[in-house]
Amino acid sequence: MKCLEVEHGLIRSVKLNEACSSGCGAFLLTVAKQLSLTLPLFVEASLASKEPCDLGTRCTVFMNSKVRQAQRDGASLEDIAAGLCRSIVRNALYKVLRIHDPAELGEHVVVQGGTFLNDAGLRALDEQIGRPI
C-alpha cells in the first residue's frame, strides 16, 4: 500500500506500507478460495453480511487464524467475508497510514489495487471513513 498526500498539485508526503499490508487483494482471493468461493461470490457474500466479524487489524499472515476461529465459532461466510474486508481497510488506515481520524485523508481520496477492484473492499472503506469514495 502506498499513500501520496497531494497539496496544491504537489506531492507533500509519501507513506509506504510495511510488508504485512502488501498483497491484500491477493489475500482476499486466497481466502475466498479457502472458503470455496470465487472472488465474485466472495464479494456477493460480503455485501450480504448482516453482522461482519471483527477479525482485528493484524496483518494478513495472522488473519488466517482469526478466520479459522470465526468458522469454529459458527460465523457465516457472509460475515467472515465482510469482516476480512473491514479488517484489511482498518489495518491500512490505522496501522499503515497511522491516521487517527478519517478526516486526515483529506477531501479527495483515490484508491487503486486489488483490494479495491471489488465492491466489498470499497464498501468497507466507505463505511470506515464515513463517506463514499
Residue ranges with predicted function:
Residues V6-S13, A124-P132:
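A glycine- and small-aliphatic-rich helix-loop capping segment at beta-alpha/alpha-beta transitions
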Residues S65-Y94:
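Adenine-nucleotide phosphate-binding core of ATP-dependent small-molecule kinases
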Residues M1-E7, E51:
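Gly/Thr-rich phosphate-binding beta-strand-loop-beta motif of the actin/hexokinase/Hsp70
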Residues R12-E51:
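Glycine-rich phosphate-binding loop plus the immediately following alpha-helix
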Residues L39-A45, K95-H108:
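Flexible, glycine/charged-enriched surface loops at secondary-structure junctions
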